[in-house]
Curated annotation (Swiss-Prot):
GO MF terms, alphabetically ordered: D-tyrosyl-tRNA(Tyr) deacylase activity; Gly-tRNA(Ala) deacylase activity; Ser(Gly)-tRNA(Ala) hydrolase activity; tRNA binding
Domain of life of the organism encoding this protein: Bacteria
Gene3D superfamilies: D-tyrosyl-tRNA(Tyr) deacylase
Keyword Cytoplasm carried by entry: yes
Organism: Thermus aquaticus
EC number: 3.1.1.96
Name of the protein: D-aminoacyl-tRNA deacylase
Length: 152
């Protein structure tokens, strides 16, 4: 499971001209899911994201977490995070999980964040979405659950 995390001052996701999710300060999380991912991967990423200390404290140091600042997450499923661009000019998406495997894990990830006290707004799984945000910093991080200690 792969997450691209962007610290945002505000963000929203629109489907068919209608806003379906919006947050004030927090993270926009673009989440990609691959075939081998499990609920353990979802829980691992949720725990990491909820506690990442990338918000500034009173001294201007990145020392506060999403929970510390009362931030929210705008969670957007994005299979293209598993696009393989090594050959040719058209990405290969064979590493991206099919919807029947990915949707329950996307929902498990969002539920795991909520269990940790994070307010979560979402896009629409599988839909064409317009995501807009005001980057804060910018601060952008990539976390891949396959790189956690003891994994695969």
């Amino acid at each position: 499971m792969r997450a691209v995390i962007q610290r945002a001052k505000e963000a929203k996701v629109t489907v068919g001209g209608e806003v379906v999710g919006a947050i004030d300060a927090g993270f926009v999380v673009l989440l990609g899911i691959t075939h081998e991912d499990t609920e353990d991967d979802a829980a691992y990423l949720a725990e990491k994201i909820a506690h990442l200390r990338v918000f500034e404290d009173e001294d201007g140091k990145m020392n506060r977490s999403l929970l510390d600042v009362g931030g929210a997450v705008l969670s957007v499923s994005q299979f293209t995070l598993y696009g393989d661009c090594r050959k040719g000019r058209r990405p290969n998406f064979m590493a991206a999980a099919k919807p029947d495997h990915a949707l329950p894990l996307y929902e498990a990830f969002n539920a795991a964040l909520r269990e940790r006290g994070v307010h979560v707004e979402t896009g629409v799984f599988g839909a064409m979405m317009d995501v807009s945000l005001t980057n804060d910093g910018p601060v952008t991080l990539i976390i891949d659950s396959s790189e956690k200690p003891g994994n695969r």
